């Protein structure tokens, strides 16, 4: 499995509740915060739903 680093680049203020909950599930609570995750189909779906709020890099 490949690892990726997910960084929150935009605030969650004013976004849909579902997007805030997705960010929280990814472990992102503040702008600039980073988390390392293993790639999976479930994770890919979560990343696609909040792609306008995050940046994804290979680890």
Swiss-Prot record:
InterPro entries: Ribo_uL30_ferredoxin-like_sf, Ribosomal_uL30_bac-type, Ribosomal_uL30_CS, Ribosomal_uL30_ferredoxin-like
CDD domains referenced in this protein's UniProt entry, alphabetically: Ribosomal_L30 (cd01658)
GO molecular function per UniProt: structural constituent of ribosome
Subunit relationships: Part of the 50S ribosomal subunit.
Organism of origin: Leptospira borgpetersenii serovar Hardjo-bovis (strain JB197)
Pfam families for this protein: Ribosomal_L30
PANTHER family: LARGE RIBOSOMAL SUBUNIT PROTEIN UL30M, MITOCHONDRIAL RIBOSOMAL PROTEIN L30
Keyword presence, Transport: no
Annotated PROSITE patterns: RIBOSOMAL_L30 (PS00634)
Family to which this protein belongs: Belongs to the universal ribosomal protein uL30 family.
Protein name, per record: Large ribosomal subunit protein uL30
GO annotation (BP), single: translation
Record keywords, A-Z: Ribonucleoprotein, Ribosomal protein
Gene name as annotated: rpmD
UniProt-listed NCBIfam families: rpmD_bact
Alphabetized Gene3D superfamilies for the sequence: Ribosomal protein L30, ferredoxin-like fold domain
GO cellular component, one term: cytosolic large ribosomal subunit
Domain of life: Bacteria
């Amino acid at each position: 499995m490949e690892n990726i680093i997910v960084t929150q680049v935009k605030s969650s203020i004013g976004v849909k509740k579902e997007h805030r909950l997705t960010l929280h599930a990814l472990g992102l609570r503040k702008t600039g915060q980073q988390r390392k995750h293993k790639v999976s189909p479930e994770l890919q779906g979560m990343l696609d739903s909040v792609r306008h709020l995050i940046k994804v890099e290979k680890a």
